Amino acid sequence: MSRLTLPKNARLLKRKQFVYVQRNGRCCRADQVTLRVVPSRHSNTRKVGITVSKKFGKAHQRNRFKRIVREAFRHVRPNLPGCQVVISPRGNSQPDFLKLSEELLQRIPEALPLASSSRC
Protein backbone atom coordinates (compact mmCIF):
# COMPACT_ATOMS: atom_id res chain seq x y z
CA MET A 1 0.00 0.00 0.00
CA SER A 2 1.45 3.37 -1.00
CA ARG A 3 1.44 6.33 1.34
CA LEU A 4 -0.41 9.26 -0.12
CA THR A 5 1.22 11.90 2.03
CA LEU A 6 3.77 14.57 1.38
CA PRO A 7 7.00 13.09 2.74
CA LYS A 8 8.83 14.90 5.50
CA ASN A 9 11.83 15.53 3.24
CA ALA A 10 9.52 17.49 0.90
CA ARG A 11 8.58 20.03 3.58
CA LEU A 12 10.27 23.07 5.03
CA LEU A 13 10.27 22.39 8.75
CA LYS A 14 12.69 24.72 10.49
CA ARG A 15 12.44 28.45 11.01
CA LYS A 16 15.84 28.89 9.36
CA GLN A 17 14.51 27.33 6.14
CA PHE A 18 11.45 29.60 6.09
CA VAL A 19 13.57 32.71 6.74
CA TYR A 20 15.97 31.77 3.92
CA VAL A 21 13.13 31.47 1.41
CA GLN A 22 11.42 34.64 2.67
CA ARG A 23 14.64 36.67 2.32
CA ASN A 24 16.02 35.21 -0.90
CA GLY A 25 12.91 34.08 -2.71
CA ARG A 26 11.06 35.76 -5.51
CA CYS A 27 7.51 36.79 -4.68
CA CYS A 28 4.79 35.66 -7.03
CA ARG A 29 1.08 36.33 -6.51
CA ALA A 30 -1.54 33.94 -7.74
CA ASP A 31 -5.31 34.40 -7.42
CA GLN A 32 -5.63 32.38 -4.22
CA VAL A 33 -2.14 32.35 -2.70
CA THR A 34 1.14 34.24 -2.48
CA LEU A 35 4.27 32.26 -3.31
CA ARG A 36 7.90 32.83 -2.36
CA VAL A 37 10.12 30.73 -4.62
CA VAL A 38 13.86 30.14 -4.47
CA PRO A 39 15.84 27.66 -6.61
CA SER A 40 16.91 24.57 -4.72
CA ARG A 41 20.56 23.90 -4.02
CA HIS A 42 20.02 20.35 -5.24
CA SER A 43 18.40 20.21 -8.66
CA ASN A 44 15.84 17.50 -7.88
CA THR A 45 14.70 18.73 -4.44
CA ARG A 46 11.24 20.28 -4.26
CA LYS A 47 10.12 21.52 -0.83
CA VAL A 48 7.10 23.42 0.40
CA GLY A 49 6.37 25.41 3.52
CA ILE A 50 2.96 26.82 4.40
CA THR A 51 2.30 29.86 6.57
CA VAL A 52 -1.16 30.93 7.69
CA SER A 53 -1.70 33.75 10.16
CA LYS A 54 -4.44 33.81 12.77
CA LYS A 55 -6.14 36.57 10.77
CA PHE A 56 -7.14 33.89 8.26
CA GLY A 57 -9.62 32.33 10.65
CA LYS A 58 -10.04 29.77 13.36
CA ALA A 59 -7.78 26.75 13.71
CA HIS A 60 -10.00 24.41 11.69
CA GLN A 61 -10.00 26.90 8.77
CA ARG A 62 -6.23 27.33 8.88
CA ASN A 63 -5.72 23.55 9.05
CA ARG A 64 -8.06 22.99 6.09
CA PHE A 65 -6.12 25.56 4.06
CA LYS A 66 -2.85 23.76 4.86
CA ARG A 67 -4.32 20.36 3.93
CA ILE A 68 -5.56 21.64 0.56
CA VAL A 69 -2.23 23.31 -0.25
CA ARG A 70 -0.18 20.26 0.80
CA GLU A 71 -2.30 17.98 -1.38
CA ALA A 72 -2.13 20.32 -4.38
CA PHE A 73 1.65 20.56 -4.03
CA ARG A 74 1.94 16.78 -3.70
CA HIS A 75 0.10 16.34 -7.00
CA VAL A 76 2.18 18.84 -8.98
CA ARG A 77 5.52 18.13 -7.27
CA PRO A 78 6.84 15.64 -9.88
CA ASN A 79 6.31 18.24 -12.64
CA LEU A 80 8.14 21.08 -10.89
CA PRO A 81 11.81 22.06 -11.18
CA GLY A 82 14.01 21.94 -8.08
CA CYS A 83 12.82 24.70 -5.76
CA GLN A 84 11.78 25.68 -2.27
CA VAL A 85 8.40 27.38 -1.94
CA VAL A 86 6.64 29.15 0.92
CA ILE A 87 2.90 29.49 0.34
CA SER A 88 0.57 31.83 2.21
CA PRO A 89 -3.10 32.65 1.59
CA ARG A 90 -4.48 35.75 -0.12
CA GLY A 91 -7.71 36.79 1.49
CA ASN A 92 -9.78 34.70 3.85
CA SER A 93 -11.38 32.19 1.49
CA GLN A 94 -10.49 28.53 1.15
CA PRO A 95 -8.70 27.73 -2.13
CA ASP A 96 -10.21 25.61 -4.87
CA PHE A 97 -8.05 22.48 -5.23
CA LEU A 98 -8.02 22.24 -9.05
CA LYS A 99 -7.45 25.95 -9.58
CA LEU A 100 -4.69 25.97 -6.96
CA SER A 101 -2.95 23.00 -8.61
CA GLU A 102 -2.98 24.80 -11.96
CA GLU A 103 -1.68 28.02 -10.39
CA LEU A 104 1.20 26.20 -8.67
CA LEU A 105 2.13 24.42 -11.88
CA GLN A 106 2.13 27.69 -13.81
CA ARG A 107 3.51 30.24 -11.32
CA ILE A 108 6.40 28.37 -9.69
CA PRO A 109 8.39 27.79 -12.93
CA GLU A 110 7.66 31.41 -13.96
CA ALA A 111 9.23 32.75 -10.77
CA LEU A 112 12.35 30.57 -10.85
CA PRO A 113 14.44 32.04 -13.68
CA LEU A 114 14.13 35.45 -12.04
CA ALA A 115 15.65 34.34 -8.77
CA SER A 116 16.40 37.86 -7.57
CA SER A 117 14.47 39.12 -4.57
CA SER A 118 11.39 41.20 -5.10
CA ARG A 119 8.71 42.61 -2.88
CA CYS A 120 5.21 41.20 -2.83
UniProtKB/Swiss-Prot annotation:
Q: Which BP terms in the Gene Ontology apply to this protein?
A: tRNA 3'-end processing; tRNA 5'-leader removal
MF (Gene Ontology)? 3'-tRNA processing endoribonuclease activity; ribonuclease P activity; tRNA binding
Q: Supply one GO CC term from the record.
A: ribonuclease P complex
Q: Which keywords describe this protein according to UniProt?
A: Endonuclease, Hydrolase, Nuclease, RNA-binding, tRNA processing
E.C. no:
3.1.26.5
Can you state which reaction this protein catalyses?
Endonucleolytic cleavage of RNA, removing 5'-extranucleotides from tRNA precursor
Please give the positions of the paired cysteines in each disulfide bond. none
Family per record = Belongs to the RnpA family.
Q: How does it assemble?
A: Consists of a catalytic RNA component (M1 or rnpB) and a protein subunit.
- What role is this protein assigned? RNaseP catalyzes the removal of the 5'-leader sequence from pre-tRNA to produce the mature 5'-terminus. It can also cleave other RNA substrates such as 4.5S RNA. The protein component plays an auxiliary but essential role in vivo by binding to the 5'-leader sequence and broadening the substrate specificity of the ribozyme.
What is the designated name of this protein? Ribonuclease P protein component
UniProt organism field:
Chlamydia trachomatis serovar D (strain ATCC VR-885 / DSM 19411 / UW-3/Cx)
Gene name per UniProt:
rnpA
